[in-house]
Regions:
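Short, hydrophobic alpha-helix immediately C-terminal to the catalytic nucleophile
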Residues: 119, 159-163
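Hydrophobic or amphipathic alpha-helical targeting/insertion segments
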Residues: 24, 30-84
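Short helix-terminating capping/connector loops at secondary-structure junctions
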Residues: 18-21, 134-144, 167-168
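Gly/Ala-rich beta-loop-alpha elbow adjacent to hydrolase catalytic centers
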Residues: 147-158
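Catalytic-loop region of hydrolases
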Residues: 1-23, 32-43, 48, 100-108, ...
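Active-site nucleophile loop of the alpha/beta-hydrolase fold
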Residues: 173-178
C-alpha cells in the first residue's frame, strides 16, 4: 500500500509438476539478494518434489540506479538508460551524485509489506499455473498446498505472511527469522 517501487516475483514450474498433487512453495529472499536469492532455499527442495516455486525479493532487491550516468537495471538484468523500462528509478534531488539502491533509496518501507509480497508471489504462482494448464481445474488456495519458506529476514517475511487473514497457507518454514 502506497509503495512507489514494485517488488519482483518469479515462478518456476518443473517438468514433473503433478496437477493432482498441487503444490506451491513460496519464498522470500533474505537481505537484499534480489529475486534469485531464495532459489537455494526453496527451489532446491520444491522443484525436485514436483512443486511450483514462487519467489519475491520482498521489495528489497538488488536493483540500482547510477545517478551520474542516468542508467539502471532493466527487468531482464541488463543495463538501460533513463526512459527505458528500468526496475528501479529513484527520485533524485538536484546536484546529487553516486549510486542509489532500491532497498535503501526507494523511499518506501518495504518491510511493512513483506507479508503481502509473499502472498502476492503465491497468487502469481496460482495465476501462472492457471495459464500453464488451462485444461485443468482452476488452481486456488483451496485446492493447492502452499508452503512458505524463508531464512533470515526472508523468514521474517514468511512469518508476516502467516499473520495475514485467510486460510491460504498450509505451512511455514522460517529459519532464523528477523
Amino acid at each position: 500500500d502506497g509503495a512507489k517501487q514494485p517488488h519482483r516475483v518469479l515462478v518456476q514450474v518443473p517438468d514433473n509438476f503433478d496437477q493432482e498433487k498441487r503444490c506451491v512453495v513460496v519464498a522470500a529472499s533474505s537481505g537484499s539478494r534480489g529475486i534469485y536469492g531464495a532459489i537455494a532455499v526453496a527451489g532446491a527442495w520444491g522443484l525436485p518434489k514436483g512443486c511450483a516455486v514462487a519467489y519475491t525479493d520482498k521489495g528489497a532487491g538488488t536493483d540500482y540506479y547510477d545517478i551520474d550516468t542516468h542508467t539502471g537495471v532493466r527487468l531482464d538484468g541488463t543495463r538501460g538508460a533513463l526512459g527505458e523500462t528500468l526496475a528501479f528509478v529513484p527520485e533524485v534531488p538536484v546536484g546529487m551524485s553516486g549510486v542509489a539502491f532500491k532497498h535503501a533509496h526507494s523511499g518506501d518501507n518495504p518491510e511493512a509489506d513483506w507479508g503481502k509480497h509473499v502472498r502476492q508471489a503465491a497468487e502469481f504462482a496460482l495465476s501462472a499455473l492457471n495459464r500453464a494448464y488451462p485444461e485443468a481445474k482452476s488452481f486456488t488456495f483451496d485446492n493447492t498446498r502452499v508452503i512458505a519458506v524463508g531464512i533470515s529476514n526472508g523468514g521474517g517475511a514468511v512469518l508476516r505472511a502467516a499473520e495475514l487473514e485467510g486460510e491460504w497457507l498450509d505451512a511455514v518454514v522460517a529459519g532464523e527469522p528477523n
